[in-house]
Amino acid sequence: MNRPDEIRIKIKFVCREGVDRRPWAGIMGEEENGRERKGSTMKLTVLGGGGVRSPFLTKSIALGAQAAGITEVVLMDSSAAKLYKYGKIAKLVGERCNPALHFMLTTDAEEALRDADYIITTIRGDADEGRVFDERTALSHGVLGQETTGAGGFAMALRSIPILTGYCELARRVAKPNVLIFNFTNPSGLVTQALRTQGYDMVYGVCDAPSGFHKQLAALLGVERERFTMRCWGLNHLSWFDSFRVDGEDVTGKILAAPRLYQDTEMKHFDPELVRLSGNFLPNEYLYFYYYSNRAVQSILSSSKTRGETILEINQKMHRALDEIDIDHDLEAAFHCFMLHYAMRENSYFTIETGGAPKNIDVPTVEEFIRQPDGGGYAGVALDFIKARATGEKIQMVLSVPNNGACPYFADGDVMELTCEIDGEGAHPLPVPEIPPMQLNLIRTVKLYENLTVEAILEKSYEKAVKALTIHPLINSYPIAKSLVDTYKERYKGYIGELS
């Protein structure tokens, strides 16, 4: 296997001639509000800071910055067009939430990462167009193209892992020696496995699905989130939940008997009988794609657009609309435009794949948005981790981390999605002494797929790439796997090089 510093990644970008085209080197080197900071600073850098979800990210960071000791936030993106729209809106929202917090926008990755204490990665190689290509390619073979599982997850890994390898190597050189990296980039668990395999032990995988489900179940019980705990085990987007407790008292029976469990939570995607057959362990919502795969594929095919095509169309409309607004001088109009289109995205979440009814998300003004209670999301998980490390106060959260003996069925180095106890020393996965055969069989198979995918990318092995997709439960076909690899490797050879 290649060492990190031996991996050579060539990626094509449309940018000015004569500019370093490595994504971790930035495109234009532009920087906004980059005045010198004096005194003690704690710097958090967001790679992919021009993403559409950035305003939610900066709100959470701004509100939690003081408790976490963060004084400076840098939003970096390789796309100046996105950064100076969504990143600028995010910066202005963050400044309104916390005027004392220093924000900066830049397309220069080295400047963004220099002396960083914490890094959040939320990138999307090949943008929305890549997602559309991945989905349609998979569907043309009759298999699911969802971007975090199966063929779609494999394709996204091809364009995510090489970029993040470059960023991690740059961070190792220029960031603080004890820098922590929170990977939000999908497929989060697989990407985290690839980075940990290469020796980037400062990387933790984060997904907001478990924390979102935790919030739903606490609301179902009518208790504060701080009083409610549960255990998560499995892989990212392939996990189950058990050990439900309020103030230490087991409430599993109450949850299973709750009349609204299958209406008010993500359990609405599953049949109660399936949960009973599964031993009454509650599944992550993405297990819908495994247990109802044919239904998901047929629902997508019967729709006029895939999820990726829907997102691409909405984002293109939003991008054009924001071109007509002076964001610096009319944040209210810019934010209204942003939220109007963002609501369209969220209202369609999981509806194309399941055939379910769309959501109905309101469009708040910027001031209403700032006043609304913060949901935390991805940033909330990262900030809670930072605070626990700083104070030594023990808390629990779900992360993708090396198994390290927590689950005896898997190797110590296997990255798994587990409930961890966080303290001043770091993350400690809680033991999972026994996994029922029904779940264990699926986890083992998908973990083998993940490890083979990582090896295929790092070793540039065509054989391992085909093997990985052949054994994946959502493909399970050698001819289809081979055809998918042939198509994806050609599209993404600018990221992974030539597979042989």
Task: Give the residues covered by each predicted segment.
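Short acidic low-complexity segments
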Residues: 102-115
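Long, compositionally biased stretches enriched for glycine and/or charged residues
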Residues: 222-500
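Short, positively charged and aromatic/hydrophobic N-terminal segments
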Residues: 6-12, 26-27, 32
